[in-house]
């Protein structure tokens, strides 16, 4: 019981103590976090919570732990690793890095890494070990090894050269560090190698062959050359094409060039290039500043050679001959260079229009050209006399000669303008390459048309004159060349060809003047000898042809329209053209433009005569001329009547009696021609026309292509056996002509020999059959018709 009370008293005492004791206050974790966040928001507390949210850390503690981590990791740590070690957000790490770098000068931020000077010192020690082992290290290799940027490494290592690193960096190429021993060794190798070189050598080939460090070699080589230890020069700088030229080679080279120029008087650019001189022209200008040289396209020549050429040209001009300067020049000089040299010499002579340059190298004096022209004088007069008898050359009037003179002046002015443009263009290029200037004309021709039968400038000339030049030529180029060869024995072929081309125009112009003068003298002496056709003779001849045309037109009407068209065209081209030419030639005689044979008058000549006629006569004659190109005989005859009236020519119309006489005379003429001919085609033609006249009592003027239509028409006019014979003979004639054409068209192919033999057999067989039938065909007209047909 006592124990129970003791326990009660004890509990009472504890209760009393509890009642009078002070109570202790405690906060929950949530309340604590809320209070801290409010303090941070009110900026009364600066702390950072960790990534797991269980701890708070002050910025100062972050900086302290970052320094500790940098020290622990050897002076180089990645900020990502710091974030993982300190267990805070990366933003807080980056914020503290700036403060650390500012406050501690020995710490740097490089590519997201903190690096201190201790780390760089250890890195420099490692680099020095490698350098002493290999003799050189490159920044590029160190960048790969230490994963650091090149500029940072170069700066860091440069600061430690001579203190930690025993070596030096190449000033021209800061990407390599050498030891003194390495540089000395390479310097000795370079000095020895380049001292042994005696000819230009590409530096790049030595680098690849002997394993030199490229930048070190260029630096050492430049140093040795500047110090005079190596005698030579480096051409091309520090490039792949850099070349080392030793002084001994340059001296030998210069000696050779001086000797060659002194002995030969010229220098070839290619020869200097083969000696190893890259820019020959610049080299020559630099070496021979005071020497007078003429620069050509591929060479330069001295004044002595220029004087020699000038003397030869001057002598040729003064003596009235020609000279080719090519033999005077070195054979290695091209024709183009020779031409440039000659142009320079011609300008220096200052003799206006005293010479002409042919083939780029041949100088011909004007006197020599005039002498060549005089060689043709006698031949011109002989040919002019002959032309007067055969060709209508005297249709060249005073006006034509004036037009020719205009053309010549136009050509000359055009050529002078071209020469002037060429001279200005070449002089503006900076080298002595002008043309002949005002003292010489350079003459060139196209080689594609040697014979010169068609003038290349004809279109250009005709545009100025509006009319054609007279179609009369003294000689063609090949003929002039042959003539000149007989008189110029030693002249080059090309010179003769160009000289002939040059002489064509002046010779033709002179010839036209000679022809005109010959005609004028001949017409004045022959005016009283009856050369001019009398009006009576003309009226008789024109009337006869007029009546013949009427009779031929009557015979045409037996045929179809197509055949009539062909016969009309043939009649207009032949008989109608003849009568037109008679009328035109009669009028031309009054203009002193008549010809001996009116058949030689062409359409162009008729147009020329028309241009000289009075307006009244021109209208009627123009219609007559144009009617030859129409398709109607009636229109032509109507125009002929008008023209005859305008010319006071009286046409005598035929009567029945006269028509019978004309028919008889025409038949007799055809019969006489048939008797003597041996040509099968002509025999068939004459026989068909005669049979037509016997059957229809009408004349027919037909071309050979209308013979089949005539034979077809005769089928109802002559006995059947005679027509059959005529058709058979026609077939043989056609077969014979076709065989001959095939034989002519075949080439010399060996495979066609057998065909040639067969063709020859066919021709021989056909010819034999024609010979056998020819007499029978002729007898259809010559014998049988004597008894069966009578015609008076």
Swiss-Prot record:
Induction: Expressed in response to endoplasmic reticulum stress. By lipopolysaccharide (LPS).
Database matches in Pfam families: E3_UFM1_ligase (PF09743), UFL1 (PF23659), UFL1_C (PF25041)
Annotated stretches, region: Disordered: 412-471
Protein name stated in the entry: E3 UFM1-protein ligase 1
Annotated stretches, region: Mediates interaction with TRIP4: 200-400
Post-translational modification N-acetylalanine, affected residues: 2
Organism ancestry: Eukaryota, Metazoa, Chordata, Craniata, Vertebrata
Family (UniProt): Belongs to the UFL1 family.
The EC number(s) this enzyme carries: 2.3.2.-
Region (Involved in CDK5RAP3-binding): 121-250
Omega-N-methylarginine carried by residues: 433
GO biological process per UniProt: DNA damage checkpoint signaling; DNA damage response; DNA repair; erythrocyte differentiation; hematopoietic stem cell differentiation; negative regulation of IRE1-mediated unfolded protein response; negative regulation of NF-kappaB transcription factor activity; negative regulation of protein ubiquitination
UniProtKB keywords: Acetylation, Chromosome, Cytoplasm, DNA damage, DNA repair, Endoplasmic reticulum, Membrane, Methylation, Nucleus, Phosphoprotein, Transferase, Ubl conjugation, Ubl conjugation pathway
Gene Ontology molecular functions: UFM1 ligase activity; UFM1 transferase activity
Residue ranges of the region described as Mediates interaction with DDRGK1: 2-200
Record's subunit section: Catalytic component of the UFM1 ribosome E3 ligase (UREL) complex, composed of UFL1, DDRGK1 and CDK5RAP3. Interacts with E2-like enzyme UFC1. Interacts with RELA. Interacts with NBN; promoting recruitment to double-strand breaks following DNA damage. Interacts (when phosphorylated) with YWHAG/14-3-3-gamma; sequestering UFL1 and preventing its association with PDCD1/PD-1 substrate.
Sequence ranges of Basic and acidic residues compositional bias: 453-471
GO CC entries: cytoplasm; cytosol; endoplasmic reticulum; endoplasmic reticulum membrane; nucleus; site of double-strand break
Subcellular location: Endoplasmic reticulum membrane; Cytoplasm, Cytosol; Nucleus; Chromosome
Protein role: E3 protein ligase that mediates ufmylation, the covalent attachment of the ubiquitin-like modifier UFM1 to lysine residues on target proteins, and which plays a key role in various processes, such as ribosome recycling, response to DNA damage, interferon response or reticulophagy (also called ER-phagy). Catalyzes ufmylation of many protein, such as CD274/PD-L1, CDK5RAP3, CYB5R3, DDRGK1, EIF6, histone H4, MRE11, P4HB, PDCD1/PD-1, TRIP4, RPN1, RPS20/uS10, RPL10/uL16, RPL26/uL24, SYVN1/HRD1 and TP53/p53.
InterPro entries from the UniProt entry: Ufl1 (IPR018611), Ufl1-like_C (IPR056761), Ufl1_dom (IPR056580), Ufl1_N (IPR056579)
């Amino acid at each position: 019981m006592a124990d129970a009370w003791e326990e009660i008293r004890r509990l009472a005492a504890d209760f009393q103590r509890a009642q009078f004791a002070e109570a202790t206050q405690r906060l929950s974790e949530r309340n604590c976090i809320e209070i801290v966040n409010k303090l941070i928001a009110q900026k009364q507390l600066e702390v950072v919570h960790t990534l797991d949210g269980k701890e708070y850390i002050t910025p100062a503690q972050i900086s302290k732990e970052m320094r500790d981590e940098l020290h622990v990791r050897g002076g180089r740590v990645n900020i990502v690793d710091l974030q993982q070690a300190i267990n805070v957000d990366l933003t807080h790490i980056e914020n503290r890095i700036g403060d650390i770098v500012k406050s501690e000068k020995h710490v740097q931020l490089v590519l997201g890494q903190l690096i201190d000077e201790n780390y760089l010192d250890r890195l420099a020690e490692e680099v020095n070990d490698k350098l002493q082992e290999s003799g050189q290290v490159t920044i590029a290799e160190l960048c790969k090894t230490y994963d650091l940027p090149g500029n940072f490494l170069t700066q860091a290592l440069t600061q430690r050269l001579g203190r930690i690193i025993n070596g030096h960096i190449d000033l021209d190429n800061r990407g390599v560090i050498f030891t003194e021993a390495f540089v000395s060794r390479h310097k000795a190798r370079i000095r020895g190698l380049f001292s042994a070189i005696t000819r230009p050598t590409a530096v790049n080939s030595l680098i690849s062959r002997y394993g030199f460090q490229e930048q070190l070699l260029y630096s050492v080589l430049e140093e040795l050359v500047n110090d005079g230890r190596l005698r030579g020069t480096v051409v091309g700088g520090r490039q792949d094409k850099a070349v080392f030229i030793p002084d001994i080679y340059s001296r030998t080279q210069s000696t050779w060039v001086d000797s060659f120029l002194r002995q030969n008087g010229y220098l070839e650019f290619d020869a200097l290039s083969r000696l190893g001189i890259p820019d020959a022209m610049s080299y020559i200008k630099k070496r021979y500043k005071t020497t007078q040289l003429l620069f050509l396209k591929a060479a330069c020549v001295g004044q002595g050679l220029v004087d020699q050429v000038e003397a030869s040209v001057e002598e040729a001009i003064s003596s009235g001959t020609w000279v080719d300067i090519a033999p005077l020049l070195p054979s290695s000089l091209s024709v183009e260079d020779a031409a440039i040299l000659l142009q320079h010499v011609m300008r220096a002579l200052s003799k206006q229009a005293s010479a002409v340059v042919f083939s780029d190298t041949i100088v011909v004096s004007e006197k020599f050209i005039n002498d060549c022209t005089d060689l043709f004088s006698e031949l011109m007069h002989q040919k002019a006399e002959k032309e007067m008898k055969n060709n209508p050359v005297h249709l060249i009037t005073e006006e034509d000669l004036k037009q020719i003179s205009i053309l010549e002046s136009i050509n000359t002015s055009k050529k002078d303008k071209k020469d002037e443009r060429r001279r200005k263009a070449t002089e503006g290029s900076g080298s002595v390459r002008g043309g002949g200037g005002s003292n010489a004309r350079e003459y060139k021709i196209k080689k594609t048309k040697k014979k010169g039968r068609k003038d290349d400038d004809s279109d250009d000339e005709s545009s100025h004159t509006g009319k054609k030049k007279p179609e009369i030529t003294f000689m063609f180029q090949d003929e002039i060349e042959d003539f000149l060869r007989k008189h110029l024995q030693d002249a080059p072929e090309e010179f003769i060809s160009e000289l002939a081309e040059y002489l064509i125009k002046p010779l033709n112009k002179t010839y036209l003047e000679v022809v005109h003068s010959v005609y004028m003298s001949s017409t004045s002496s022959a005016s009283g000898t009856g050369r001019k056709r009398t009006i009576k003779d003309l009226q008789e001849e024109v009337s006869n042809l007029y009546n013949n045309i009427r009779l031929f037109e009557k015979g045409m009407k037996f045929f179809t329209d197509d055949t009539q068209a062909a016969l009309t065209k043939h009649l207009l081209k032949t008989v109608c053209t003849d009568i037109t030419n008679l009328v035109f030639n009669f009028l031309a005689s009054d203009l002193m433009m008549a010809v001996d044979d009116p058949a030689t008058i062409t359409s162009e000549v008729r147009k020329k005569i028309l241009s000289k006629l009075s307006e009244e006569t021109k209208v009627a004659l123009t219609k007559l001329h144009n009617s030859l190109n129409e398709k109607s005989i009636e229109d032509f005859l109507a125009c002929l009547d008008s023209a005859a009236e305008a010319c006071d020519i009286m046409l005598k119309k035929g009567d029945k009696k006269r028509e019978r006489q004309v028919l008889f005379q025409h038949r007799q003429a055809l019969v006489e021609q048939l008797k003597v001919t041996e040509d099968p085609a002509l025999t068939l033609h004459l026989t068909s026309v005669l049979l037509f006249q016997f059957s229809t009592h009408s004349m027919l003027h037909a071309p050979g292509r209308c013979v089949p239509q005539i034979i077809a028409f005769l089928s109802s006019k002559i006995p059947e056996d005679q027509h059959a014979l005529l058709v058979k003979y026609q077939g043989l004639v056609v077969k014979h002509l076709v065989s001959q054409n095939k034989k002519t068209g075949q080439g010399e192919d060996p495979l066609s020999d057998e065909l040639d033999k067969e063709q020859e057999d066919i021709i021989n067989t056909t010819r034999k059959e024609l010979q056998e039938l020819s007499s029978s065909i002729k007898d259809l007209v010559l014998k049988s018709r004597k008894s069966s047909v009578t015609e008076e």
